[in-house]
Every structure is written in structure tokens, then in C-alpha cells.
Amino acid sequence: MIYQALKSFLIPILVSLFRPNVSGLRHVPQTGKAIIASNHLSFSDSVFMPLVVPRKVTFLAKSEYFTSPGLKGFIKKYIFIALGQVPVDRSGGRRSEAALLTGLRLLSEGACIGIYPEGTRSPDGKLYKGRTGIARMALESGAPVIPVAMLNT
């Protein structure tokens, strides 16, 4: 509910200010499980992509967004939780396994999840080697993977 309210409020503002150029939305299924895999250039990627995709996108977001100290950390955590984002521990091993299982559960419920296969933002705009979690989720769930290229964000 908060997701749709924020989306309805922000879309006109962001579209009029930034004029995003979007093509290929026909490849995003209207219902059912799907994985949107994108490069990650800036924090704004996580704002723009869900706004232009016509259905809810649940991101697997780094756990630090949910545990930062102070008022800024509290606000960030509240926003991410309100938008239904899921914390991911990127330290590897069993901790990362829990994130994969959460992603698989969401996909089994018909969710559309967003993931940045590189695992973090690119410091220089280049595409870096992706991690294997997205391939594992796609293979185990049978969800289609929709590649996305974010440019000039």
C-alpha cells in the first residue's frame, strides 16, 4: 500500500524532472515470478527502476541499509521496510544463503524481484563480474530473467 502511494506520488515528479527513457517494458510479465537483473551505477537506480516498471519490484538490498545508526539510518530502514525491500547479508557463506532462500521464497509467491548481480554499485561505470546468486535463483525457481541496462544515473 505504501509502495503504490509513493509510486503514484513520485512518478510525475521524477518523470518531469529527469525524463527517463525506457524501452522494453513489454518483456516484464504483468504477473507471476520474474527477476529483473540490472547493472548498478548509483543509489538512484533503486528509485528509478521500480518507478518505471509497471508492477511492484522487491529488491534484495544490502543489510547495511537496515542497520545504519542515527536518525538517517532510522529513516533509511523505515523507508526500505515500508517499500517491502529485503535485507541481504553479502558477507558470503551461510549468511548469503539465507538471502537466496528469501529470494526463492518470494519468487515462489509470484513476486518480481530486483537484483544487482555485481553485488554493489560500480565505482567507475564499468560492468564487473556478477555473483552467482541470480543464476541459482533463476535455475531453481524457473523465473524469467529480464536484463536491464541503467545508463547515466
Describe the predicted segments one by one.
Residues Y3, K7, L14-T153:
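Soluble catalytic domains of membrane acyltransferases
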